[in-house]
Design a protein with these regions (language model features):
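Buried hydrophobic packing segments
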Residues: 30, 97-107, 135-138, 196-199, ...
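Acidic/histidine-rich catalytic neighborhood of metal-dependent amide-processing enzymes
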Residues: 98-171, 369-370
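Acidic-glycine-rich active-site phosphate/pyrophosphate-binding loop
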Residues: 66-81, 150-151, 167-177, 332
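Acidic/His- and Gly-rich active-site-bordering loop/insert found
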Residues: 1-90, 108-116, 328
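Metal-dependent amide/peptide-bond hydrolase catalytic core
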Residues: 159, 172-370
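Short, surface-exposed alpha-helical segments at coil->helix boundaries
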Residues: 7, 24-28, 97, 258-262, ...
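Short, conserved micro-motifs enriched in small and acidic residues
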Residues: 85-98, 105, 190-193, 348-355
Length: 370
């Protein structure tokens, strides 16, 4: 796949709307592109993922390039101006996904077969939702029983073409309601809103204590208040509907923490809490001393010997949090683009950077297969 074809690939993919749970058109289109680019097998799987494979499915080694094909909402007119591709998903994360598709195509079926390597490229669905449906399906498929477990994995997320991401913090979401019988505001009892504020203050104090002596944000417990709505119901109760969220550091005991939260909530005598935890993802941090990282070092040097590979730890989550704890293989995230543009109305990707990243993926696969 040459530069012009690779650019048409990413532009075409970005031009197809694919909100979470609405990815079918983009998945079908990408499968056709992979078939045309020489993939041995390309199909939409049961989860809705776009999947392309190079080499023998029963090869001695498997590497999974796991991108995601869904985006957050936002209508940004798709265009290329002054080397910049504008459009929703150009950075997060159709640019990285197209990088995988094009880079693996350049590596090619013949090279994969000669090296005894099975290359699997995935455009996963629902990464932007808390479900990560596509990644969970792939994690179960390549579990060592249904299909050989991968020897390495690359997650498709923007980190610039000359950097790789080694880890992501975990996540926990708490949706809850708190209600209590109505009372006069001049009375002695605290309002339900005040009670929830006290609950939130406990959360922030707990985080402050947990973070003592930890200077790096990646190592800290980071709570956020995402929703706080007061109302009254037909039972003459005052109600708060709220959501708390946490970014979790490596080694954090989420089960114990949820037990603590339940205990604190049950301690407010007049207030009934209904807590619903969801969206838990385990934090994950990979090693930088392994064959996959060395392959990236070799790939980057081949593309541009003057560049040095950078290493990043991120405070959000990605599908690395889903598959890392299952596969326990060397894993990094890679992709062109500035992640500060994720989800913004000005989202855009440098075409030149994208092409460099395509070549880095090709050369990394060559180094990995050696």
């Amino acid at each position: 796949m040459d530069r012009e074809s690779a650019i048409e690939l990413v532009r075409g993919l970005v031009a197809i709307p694919s909100l979470s749970r609405q990815e079918s058109a983009a998945s079908a289109w990408l499968v056709e592109q992979m078939r045309g680019a020489g993939y041995d097998r390309a199909y939409v799987d049961e989860a809705g993922n776009a999947v392309g494979e190079l080499g023998d499915a029963h090869a001695s080694r498997t590497i999974v390039l796991l991108g995601h094909i869904d985006t957050v909402p936002g209508n940004i007119p798709v265009r290329i101006e002054n080397d910049l591709l504008y459009g929703r998903g150009s950075v997060d994360a159709k640019g990285p996904l197209a990088t995988f598709v094009a880079g693996a195509a350049r590596f090619g079926s013949a090279a994969a077969k000669a090296a005894g390597l099975h290359v699997v490229v995935v455009g996963a669905v629902e990464e932007e939702a808390a479900t990560s449906k596509g990644a969970r399906f792939i994690a179960k498929r390549f579990n060592g029983t249904n299909a050989p477990a991968p020897g390495a994995c690359i997650i498709g997320e923007p980190s610039h073409w000359n950097r790789i991401t080694l880890g992501y913090k975990g996540r926990l979401l708490l949706d809850f309601t708190a209600d209590q019988p109505m009372a006069h505001t001049a009375g002695p009892d605290a309002s339900v809103a005040s009670v929830v504020v006290d609950f939130w203050n406990w959360v922030t104090a707990h985080a402050a204590k947990a973070n003592e002596g930890k200077d790096k944000v990646f190592d800290q417990l980071s709570p956020s208040l995402r929703r706080f709505i007061t109302s009254a119901n037909e039972e003459i109760h005052d109600v708060v509907d709220a959501q708390f969220a946490w970014r979790l550091p490596v080694g954090f005991d989420a089960e114990q923490f949820m037990t603590e939260l339940r205990t604190v909530a049950s301690g407010f005598s007049r207030t009934t809490f209904d807590l619903k935890f969801r969206g838990y993802e385990k934090p994950w941090k990979g090693d930088r001393n392994n064959a996959l990282v060395r392959s990236f070092l070799a790939g980057l040097r081949t593309v541009d010997a003057s560049e040095k590979l950078g290493f990043v730890l991120k405070t959000g989550t990605s599908d690395m949090n889903v598959v890392g704890p299952v596969w326990h293989c060397p894993i990094v995230a890679y992709g062109p683009g500035d992640s500060s543009l994720d989800h913004t109305p000005n989202e855009h990707l440098s075409v030149d950077e994208y092409w460099k990243a395509v070549n880095v993926i090709e050369e990394t696969l060559i180094a990995w297969s050696a």
